[in-house]
Amino acid sequence: MNENLFASFITPMILGLPLVTLIVLFPSLLFPTSDRLVNNRFVTLQQWMLQLVSKQMMSIHNPKGQTWTLMLMSLILFIGSTNLLGLLPHSFTPTTQLSMNLGMAISLWAGAVITGFRNKTKTSLAHFLPQGTPTPLIPMLVIIETISLFIQPMALAVRLTANITAGHLLIHLIGGATLALMSISATTALITFIILILLTILEFAVAMIQAYVFTLLVSLYLHDNT
């Protein structure tokens, strides 16, 4: 457990050496580039996954919307790598901070909405009032649709923050329980350690899935406004 509420903001150190450089360079190690004519298996797998994700996300977009491909692929790589930072010992996950996620979500959401009002003003305004709405319900539905529109960035940020934070808290708690049980019951400690390993593997999957979900929702917002 942390000694105080501010312990997580202290620069992580090992043998008196700061780990900031290692933490900053860690994401780049996950996405190596090959200078050979024939790529190795890891680079080939990386390119295949990026092409698969790109194909799934951009299949719903028209030719004009295809221009967002580079931005969306950069976004999913950025979120995925920052999510994985928390699994590096003595490091900190930036995406557990609601302020960062909210700033990122609001910027992307606002860009999509402004693009929609600029390019398709009538269509964007029509989203506030579904077709065939009874006249007495028009004011209420306009208010509801407006609220739902402004809740979208909050939902994006809270979803990412909650899922990443919950996984890291579970790893922290089970890791502490494993250390406490080592002096009490070796068998129970071994079982808890196995659970910790499985949970860590699951957290790797959650980190990538949450990056995919965040980027997919941004892609859908862009699709509705382009």
From Swiss-Prot:
Pfam families: ATP-synt_A (PF00119). The keyword Transport applies. It catalyses: H(+)(in) = H(+)(out). InterPro entries: ATP_synth_F0_asu, ATP_synth_F0_asu_AS, ATP_synth_F0_asu_bact/mt, F0_ATP_A_sf. One of its GO terms (molecular function) is proton-transporting ATP synthase activity, rotational mechanism. One of its GO terms (cellular component) is proton-transporting ATP synthase complex. It is a multi-pass membrane protein. Its main location: mitochondrion. It comes from the Eukaryota. It is found in: Mitochondrion inner membrane. One of its GO terms (biological process) is proton transmembrane transport. Gene3D superfamilies: ATP synthase, F0 complex, subunit A (1.20.120.220). The keyword Mitochondrion applies. Keywords: ATP synthesis, CF(0), Hydrogen ion transport, Ion transport, Membrane, Mitochondrion, Mitochondrion inner membrane, Transmembrane, Transmembrane helix, Transport. Component of the ATP synthase complex composed at least of ATP5F1A/subunit alpha, ATP5F1B/subunit beta, ATP5MC1/subunit c (homooctomer), MT-ATP6/subunit a, MT-ATP8/subunit 8, ATP5ME/subunit e, ATP5MF/subunit f, ATP5MG/subunit g, ATP5MK/subunit k, ATP5MJ/subunit j, ATP5F1C/subunit gamma, ATP5F1D/subunit delta, ATP5F1E/subunit epsilon, ATP5PF/subunit F6, ATP5PB/subunit b, ATP5PD/subunit d, ATP5PO/subunit OSCP. Belongs to the ATPase A chain family. Subunit a, of the mitochondrial membrane ATP synthase complex (F(1)F(0) ATP synthase or Complex V) that produces ATP from ADP in the presence of a proton gradient across the membrane which is generated by electron transport complexes of the respiratory chain. ATP synthase complex consist of a soluble F(1) head domain - the catalytic core - and a membrane F(1) domain - the membrane proton channel. These two domains are linked by a central stalk rotating inside the F(1) region and a stationary peripheral stalk. This is ATP synthase F(0) complex subunit a.
